[in-house]
Structure formats: structure tokens, C-alpha cells
Amino acid sequence: MIILKADYKKYNVSELEKLRMDEEKFYETFDNAILLQTCNRVEIIFDADSLEEIKGIENIDLEKFDILFGDKAIEHLFRVACGLESMIVGEDQILGQLKNAYLKAKEKGRISKKLEKIILKAIHTGQRARVETKINEGGVSIGSAAVELAEKIFGLEGKNVLLIGAGEMANLVIKALKEKNIKAIIVANRTYEKAEKLAKELGGMAIKFDKLEEALRYADIVISATGAPHPILNKERLKNAGKTIIIDIANPRDTTDDIRELPDIFLFTIDDLRLVAEENLKKRKEEIPKVEMIICEELERLKEFLDKMRFETAIKELGQYIENVRKKEVEKAKKILKNKNKPVEEVLEDFSKALCKRIIYDIIKIFENVEDKEVFECLAKEFKKLGNKNKN
């Protein structure tokens, strides 16, 4: 197997964007290949032993990619599936992206039996890692840490969540919020159209910014993520809010410190969240050795399967080779019987000798090409056993 790899470790997002390929053109060009493209990586997975045997490889700028071969390529793929090669260690999204890449290749009929087995084993390994270890537990982004903190302290099920802001920081919490069983999500933003768009994505409702005080009275959890140059939430504005958790992930801050004086308000800032995220990331990294053990186990199982597959393929090819030799010798024998006045017994004798001679000649050539002494001795031993068996 061969993998061409370009990822966030070597390129920024805009540079990776230039390396992305059109999927339709890719699958029109390449056989036995899978294209894996995310915002942080572009990887091409080939079922091939050398670059020279890949038809269409000249269409790829190989200098832009790191190239992995054989066992190293397979191990890398398993690490990718487990989230060990991700920017955020253990993230779940890559597993879904790998599945989708596999399904696309399968749909196009561009995947060999061997490559399919390797990909499915990688996906299975990624699933095992997430079930048997804590590699994907705990929010490690500011957005997911905000949601995790709210859930730990107050619980999210059946709660009303107010999201203030609809910019980049607000988008950090969207995915994490979607997965929770929240009673209602309200989005407030100075530009109502942006609030409306975000609310639609979250299955919530949008309000105009002048309705913020009213929304604050009903909210159990407030996540503030505006791009305002000055605080928008202070003690005076929140004095009638009741028991509320406020999570401020804006930079600069959306909240003032005097909010902490209110007995029913629990305020957490981006600094608190950063500590949560860093602690969670540390815990994930502690799980890496356990994941690597799972990878080793699954690689060993895959090796056993691939060895068996290679053996079955070799036997099939050997059978085809013998059949081809047999057909040629049969045709020769038929011509002799037709054109020459020779006894059938003699023709059959000549036919069997010619068949054996041809096969023995090619077996000798195989022995001559074996460079590994142990392999040579093993083959010689087995052929000797075969010879002794036929004497009895």
C-alpha cells in the first residue's frame, strides 16, 4: 500500500486547499485508490507496491506530499482513524470522514478487495479505540469545553440556552450544543439575519438584540461570544436574571467582573475554559499508549489476513500457470496424434514427460531466484517431503 500525505503539520489551511482534488476527476483517473480530504489533510491511499505501477500518477505533484509505503502506510492509516494524527487528539470527525471516503470509492467501483479490507480494519480500529479508551472524551476546544462545563455544573437537558453572538466564536459551540437534549436555544445578535441563520442551524429561535434583557430572565445558561469591543453584560443588566450560568468565550470579554457579586450567577471566562480544555487534552494524551496497543493488535490481525490472502492468490496463480502449461502440451499431443502415426500410449508418455519437464524447469528458476537462505531451505525441505510422499 502507498499513501501520499499532506496535512496541517506541514501546510496551513489555504495551502492544503490548493492541494485538494476534484473527486469525480480523481476517480476517473485512478483505480484501487481512495481520496481522503478534510480541512486539515489531503491523503491519497493506493493499493500498489510502487509509484511506477500507478496509472495516472504523473497528474500528481509528488513533491508536495510525504510518501509512505507498505506497513508504515497501513500503520499511519490506523493512527489517522484513531485520531492520533489529528490536530485535536482523538477527535471523532475523522472517523466519519474516512468512512465517507471509503463509501465514495466503493460507489465508484475503484476499490480492490485488499484495499477494502485495510480500510474497514482501520475504521474498526478507530471504533475500538473510542469504545475501549477515553481518547475522545472531554472537550478540548473552547466551544466544546464551554458546553461541557455547563453540562457538568447545571446539566443541559431540559434547559433554556441563550447564545449571544453569531460570529466565529459562536460557531465553536454549535456542534457541541446540537448533540444535547436542550429544551430551547435562543440566539441574539446585533445583526438579526445572522442570528436567524444560526438559530435555524441549531433548531432554535432568533431574537433582536433589544430583546436581550427579556431573554436573560428566561435563560438557564448564557453563552456569550460576540465580537464587541466592550462588555455587554454587567451586574446591573443581570440583577433580575435569577439562577444562571454565564460562559463568556468572547475575546475581548463580554462580561464585567462585578457579575460575580450576584449570588445566583455563576460566571466562567475563556481563561477558565482554556484550563478545562488543556486538562482534557492532557487526559486524552495519557490514553495514547492504550490506543497504540489496540493499533498493534489490529495490525497483527490484518497481517495474518493479508498473508492468507497472498497465499490464496499465489495458489490461484500457480493453478492458472499449470493449467496454461497443460493446455499447450495437450495441443501439441493432439497435433502429433493427428499428423503422425504414433501409438497413443507413446504420445501420452511424451505428453506427461513434457508437462513435468516444463513445470520442473520453472520450479528450478524459482529456487535460483530465492535469495533468503531460510526460505530456500524451507522450500527444499517441503519439496523433499512431497517427493517422499509420492514414493509410498
Swiss-Prot record:
This protein's pathway reads: Porphyrin-containing compound metabolism; protoporphyrin-IX biosynthesis; 5-aminolevulinate from L-glutamyl-tRNA(Glu): step 1/2
Function of the protein: Catalyzes the NADPH-dependent reduction of glutamyl-tRNA(Glu) to glutamate 1-semialdehyde (GSA).
Give the record's subunit note.
Answer: Homodimer.
Q: Where does substrate bind?
A: T38, C39, N40, R41, S86, E91, D92, Q93, Q97
State the reactions this protein catalyses: (S)-4-amino-5-oxopentanoate + tRNA(Glu) + NADP(+) = L-glutamyl-tRNA(Glu) + NADPH + H(+)
Q: Domain annotation text? A: Possesses an unusual extended V-shaped dimeric structure with each monomer consisting of three distinct domains arranged along a curved 'spinal' alpha-helix. The N-terminal catalytic domain specifically recognizes the glutamate moiety of the substrate. The second domain is the NADPH-binding domain, and the third C-terminal domain is responsible for dimerization.
Q: Does the keyword Oxidoreductase apply?
A: yes
CDD domains hit by this protein: NAD_bind_Glutamyl_tRNA_reduct
Q: Which UniProt keywords apply?
A: NADP, Oxidoreductase, Porphyrin biosynthesis
Q: Which gene encodes it?
A: hemA
One protein family per Pfam: Shikimate_DH
Q: What else is known?
A: During catalysis, the active site Cys acts as a nucleophile attacking the alpha-carbonyl group of tRNA-bound glutamate with the formation of a thioester intermediate between enzyme and glutamate, and the concomitant release of tRNA(Glu). The thioester intermediate is finally reduced by direct hydride transfer from NADPH, to form the product GSA.
Q: What is this protein called?
A: Glutamyl-tRNA reductase
Important for activity (site feature) positions? H76
Task: Give GO MF terms, alphabetically.
Answer: glutamyl-tRNA reductase activity; NADP binding
